[in-house]
Each structure stands twice: as C-alpha cells, then as structure tokens.
Curated annotation (Swiss-Prot):
Residues annotated as binding Cu cation: 44, 46, 61, 118
Signal sequence annotation: none
Function: Destroys radicals which are normally produced within the cells and which are toxic to biological systems.
UniProt-recorded name of the protein: Superoxide dismutase [Cu-Zn]
One GO cellular component term: cytoplasm
Organism of origin: Prionace glauca
Catalytic reaction list: 2 superoxide + 2 H(+) = H2O2 + O2
C-alpha cells in the first residue's frame, strides 16, 4: 500500500513525503523538505487530520497506547514519534525512514492523520522535563499535511 503527504505551512517550509508498506512489514517514508533552518527538526505523525486552523488543529502526537514520548527506536514512544529529519546548509532535508510501529491500513492506520515537521530538534523524550515526555521539546509546527492514500 502507498500513501503521500504534501507539507505546507505559513512560511517557506514545504515538502513531499511518500509512504509505502508491504503486507505487515515496516512503513518506509521517503521525502524531501525545503525551507528549513540547517540542523535537526522534530518529525511526527499527529492524531488528527484536521488542519482547519493550520497545523495546531492536528492535535497531539498520535499515541494510541498512552505512552510517553520517545525516539523512533525506543520501546516507550508514541506511535507517531519519528525522531528528527536533518536539513543541510541549504535548508533541505532528504530522508528515508523505516518504522515498524506505523501502519497504512487497519485500526491503527495513519491514513487521514497529519504529518508535522517542527521548528526545533526533538530531544527524544530525554530532556528531563514534562514537556520532553509529551513533545520532545520540538517547538512550533513549521509545516504539515494530511496523509492520504496514493495510487499503487
């Protein structure tokens, strides 16, 4: 199964992310985001596909198991915690991520939810404060888009 997300925000940040999953295998995300400041930026699937008031309408990180925030390789993490994407000196982040907790079908599907790129680096839940355990201290939402089904 395939999916796509077009990221847009109020500023210069834009991007496209393609998703692919074969049977019960991991979801592969391949994408490019431009207009970022150089460095790492938090990258998450948020709970809702609602962008009526911009990216803030997307709600919190997708977290069906009520866990604390963590890194993509941690046992204790939100399903939507994808860690960071890293922008080069030109503000472009090109990436490929494989994730076993995401699904493109079934009751925990991320189709119809929002993908968000954040202003700051995600501390992966290791910041030592409550906000770290909720959001990774990733800061404001620079761009977002609803994940939709794509043609196979």
């Amino acid at each position: 199964m395939k999916a796509v997300c077009v990221l847009k925000g109020t500023g210069e940040v834009t991007g496209t992310v393609l998703f692919e999953q074969a049977a019960d295998g991991p979801v592969t995300l391949k994408g490019s985001i431009t207009g970022l400041t150089p460095g790492k930026h938090g990258f998450h699937v948020h709970a809702f596909g609602d962008n009526t008031n911009g990216c803030i309408s997307a709600g919190p990180h997708y977290n069906p198991f009520s866990k604390n925030h963590g890194g993509p390789d941690d046992e204790e993490r939100h399903v939507g915690d994808l860690g960071n994407v890293e922008a080069n000196g030109n503000g472009v982040a090109e990436f490929e991520i494989k994730d076993r907790q995401l699904h493109l079908s079934g009751e925990r599907s991320i189709i119809g939810r929002t993908l968000v790129v954040h202003e700051k680096e995600d501390d992966l839940g290791k910041g030592g404060d409550e906000e770290s355990l909720r959001t990774g201290n990733a800061g404001s939402r620079l761009a977002c888009g609803v994940i939709g089904i794509a043609k196979d």
